[in-house]
Curated annotation (Swiss-Prot):
Disulfide bonds: none annotated. Involved in pyrimidine catabolism. May facilitate the hydrolysis of carbamate, a reaction that can also occur spontaneously. This is Putative carbamate hydrolase RutD. Pfam families: Abhydrolase_1. GO terms for molecular function: hydrolase activity, acting on carbon-nitrogen (but not peptide) bonds, in linear amides. Keywords: Hydrolase. It comes from Escherichia coli O6:H1 (strain CFT073 / ATCC 700928 / UPEC). It is an enzyme of class 3 (hydrolase). It catalyses: carbamate + 2 H(+) = NH4(+) + CO2.
């Protein structure tokens, strides 16, 4: 992948288009903010699409000190500006958790640009259970620092049997996450933006086709949140994975990738046919 030449916008990683005028798919990760979250999807997506991934502002190769009132709307605006600076004006969005919120904001604020939205373990507004999970994680962060946050994170992302079979991998991932930790203040400001977001009054204004993917065994975000999202979005379809946890695209990429590829192809065709 090459880095966007824009010096004024966030850095983006773009795959070469597989053919002329190939559709663009933008991948938006969750609270961790790292574009590398989507590694299990890149090889299959870039055969059919030009793929954009990036480290969100305040994380990875887009370091910054975030304002206390940092918001989902700001996340959407800075991403759209970076895409336009890279010459991309129309794109599909695949967002995981916080990334799904950014995707909905993009669909509301830039409806002429967002062709299709895929929400992975997303929600309209934060569920009481999810809020409780984050309260526990925040307490760990305040009492034990970055290491406690990083060590607890897999418990909320992955199924227990998947973790038990991959202890060395989790240790390596934990060390990497700690080395590239986004910083306590940035993390809390991004988390507060997530907790404040509420699309319950505006979801019916999202007119692009939406694919909703959720995992029934997600510990962090109950699958009922995706059912609420499906009911609120006028043009949506919902797929439920029986296994995979919150990071189902990582733990069961074969199932997830098949759902994603079929959904993108169908919804992009549906969108073009409607124009």
């Amino acid at each position: 992948m090459r880095i966007s030449p824009s010096e004024t916008a966030m850095k983006l990683s773009l795959s070469p288009p597989p053919y002329a005028d190939a559709p663009v798919v933008v991948l938006i990760s969750g609270l961790g903010g790292s574009g590398s979250y989507w590694l299990p999807q890149l090889a299959v997506l870039d055969q059919e699409y030009q793929v954009v991934c990036y480290d969100q502002r305040g994380t990875g190769n887009n370091p910054d000190t975030l304002a206390e009132d940092y918001s989902i709307a700001q996340m959407a605006a800075e991403l759209h500006q970076a895409l336009v600076a890279a010459g991309i004006e129309r794109y599909a969005v695949v967002g995981h958790a916080l990334g799904a919120l950014v995707g909905m904001q993009l669909a509301l604020d830039y409806p002429a640009s967002v062709t299709v939205l895929v929400s992975v373990n997303g929600w309209l507004r934060i569920n009481a259970h999810t809020r409780r999970c984050f309260q526990v994680r925040e307490q760990l962060l305040h009492s034990g620092g970055a290491q406690a946050w990083v060590e607890a994170q897999p418990l909320f992302l992955y199924p227990a049997d998947w973790m038990a079979a991959r202890a060395p991998r989790l240790e390596a991932e934990g060390a990497l996450a700690l080395a590239h930790f986004q910083g306590k203040n940035n993390l809390l400001r991004r988390l507060n933006a997530l907790k404040r977001a509420d699309f319950s009054r505006h979801a019916d204004r999202i007119r692009c086709p939406v694919q909703i993917i959720c995992a029934s065994d997600d510990l962090l975000v109950p699958s009922a949140c995706s059912s609420e999202l499906h009911a609120a979005l006028p043009d949506s379809q919902k797929m439920v994975m029986r296994y995979g946890g919150h990071a189902c695209n990582v733990t069961d990429p074969e199932t997830f990738n098949a759902l994603l590829l079929n959904g993108l192809a169908s919804l992009l065709h549906h969108r073009e046919a409607a124009l």
